[in-house]
Amino acid sequence: MAIKIRKLDSAGEGFAAELRAVLAFEASEDDAIERAVAQILADVKARGDAAVLDYTNRFDRLNAASVAALELPQSELEAALEGLEPKRRAALEAAAARVRGYHEKQKIECGSHSWQYTEADGTVLGQKVTPLDRVGLYVPGGKAAYPSSVLMNAIPARVAGVGEIVMVVPTPDGLKNDLVLAAALLGGVDRVFTIGGAQAVAALAYGTQTVPAVDKICGPGNAYVASAKRRVFGTVGIDMIAGPSEILVLCDGTTDPSWVAMDLFSQAEHDELAQSILLCPDEAFIERVEKAIGELLPTMPRQDVIRASLEGRGALVKVRDMAEACRIANDIAPEHLEISALEPHQWGKQIRHAGAIFLGRYTSESLGDYCAGPNHVLPTSRTARFSSPLGVYDFFKRSSLIEVSAEGAHTLGEIASELAYGEGLQAHAKSAEYRMKGAGDRQKG
């Protein structure tokens, strides 16, 4: 059966409206899910371990005697790594090493160090940078097991110097994924609990008798997990609420069309709501890509998902030139942006909004997903306009440092008291003035 992908032309009269329709996505809020999550959070907050145990045994069809029994010892993670097929173990270890190396360099460059300076009067100003004490990592379980996500979330936290990393992963029917457990070991995870869903998010946010409360929760999950993360935000930090995966390919027509087709598939196979778009000034090349899609789709194990994604939210867009493609790309602000062209850096300089930019025809998005090194946790749904990939900077917090000298107390006090009186806050003004007087008396003495 032929696949029907939307085809647009930027020169068309209604192009702007057509593109908006392609991009339109609003996460549906299921009232039943919201009510269930609210109840689970409240229950875990009130009953702690007992509630977590009840929900875990019910939803994952287990018969655990306690939450403590759901914690995996480090020896089990070590056994999972040892038991991997050698080639797969080597790939996982290589990916972990590359992700760690990238984030160690990122730590050096991203302002992760405290700093201060001294003014002429002896006043010291600066900033103290501190890693978070404890971070929670949510990992989907069952069939949707992604060891790469474990590495991408755990390694930057460990590189940042987070004191403790606590991972939760559901194990429906007791099924454990050795790749996920091995990735937890390589990523430096300290504790692993086999719990999931909203109850796991609640346990991490509020703490229970067994599960320690964390300062921030990271990691993907289903609609229940996303709702729970939204609700606990403020009690703890969260990484983001990610939407469906996205890829935007800018191509000048010089890349093998089958490569481009497979790159579009690489996001479409995630789920039916994923979005894959091609922008290209060469109409004949677009037709070749369309033909390659039709030829390659039947070879894909997840062809039904890919078809639904491409037909529902995909597009092949003819643009006037590559400069226009860059302008459109900035408006879309995609999660993944491939610039598959002879001169990728020329066009890359024009890109301002994208979660990750893949330069050159040999740079497939899938390499970034697994092993290039940069983080694959990226902003979606146009949030790349104001958000960044997950990184070591997400696991630091900053405190301002102020140490005022006696002379500085006089200089700053005059400014502060004047402004405080202007705002009608007399105690603020007096607090500054007392120190002005005290500093003056000390200098006289």
From Swiss-Prot:
Entry EC no(s): 1.1.1.23
Keyword list, A-Z: Amino-acid biosynthesis, Histidine biosynthesis, Metal-binding, NAD, Oxidoreductase, Zinc
Gene giving rise to this polypeptide: hisD
Pfam families, alphabetized: Histidinol_dh (PF00815)
Residues annotated as transmembrane: none
Family statement drawn from the similarity comment of this UniProt entry: Belongs to the histidinol dehydrogenase family.
Active site residues according to the UniProt entry: 335 (proton acceptor), 336 (proton acceptor)
Name of the molecule in the record: Histidinol dehydrogenase
